């Protein structure tokens, strides 16, 4: 492995099952793919080498937000938050993740349909290495713009 970003997981979660990454496929005609009828949450997990432990950042809040996004998009899938959390943890364990990691939990309209379809809903969880940015260690300079957005009810 050249660096921390070369890591590809061996397994992913697809539609409620752990499958090898090479076998994880969705149709190119799936509305989630062709029309971006999908929602996702990006979740970070940080490896603590002193404690030999992976810590997932605010996983409960991320899953609640994913569930809310699914409601807003009217995706027809009952998401059990505890089971989804368990699935994420299980995936990290089976991939033997011991590095800072990005977890992408997503739900989408699967199979065949148009952009107004509400089902069938597919889901996937992937994780891959994403080290902390150099700015984490060195700091970053920012400025605040004085520009203000117009009110939504202005003409």
Language-model-detected regions and their locations in the chain:
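Short, acidic/charged, Gly/Pro-enriched secondary-structure junctions
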Residues: 84-113
């Amino acid at each position: 492995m050249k660096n921390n970003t070369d890591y590809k997981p061996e397994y992913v979660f697809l539609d409620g099952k752990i499958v090898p990454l090479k076998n994880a496929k969705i149709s190119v005609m799936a509305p989630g793919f062709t029309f971006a009828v999908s929602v996702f949450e990006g979740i970070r997990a940080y490896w603590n080498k002193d404690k030999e432990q992976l810590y997932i950042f605010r996983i409960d809040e991320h899953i609640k937000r994913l569930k809310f996004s699914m409601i807003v998009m009217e995706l027809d899938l009952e998401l059990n938050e505890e089971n989804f959390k368990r699935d994420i943890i299980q995936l990290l364990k089976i991939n033997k993740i011991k590095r800072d990691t990005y977890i992408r939990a997503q739900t989408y309209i699967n199979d065949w349909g148009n952009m107004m379809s509400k089902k069938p809903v597919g889901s996937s969880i992937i994780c891959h290495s994403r080290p902390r940015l150099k700015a984490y260690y060195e700091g970053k300079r920012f400025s605040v713009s004085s520009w203000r957005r117009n009110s939504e009810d202005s003409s």
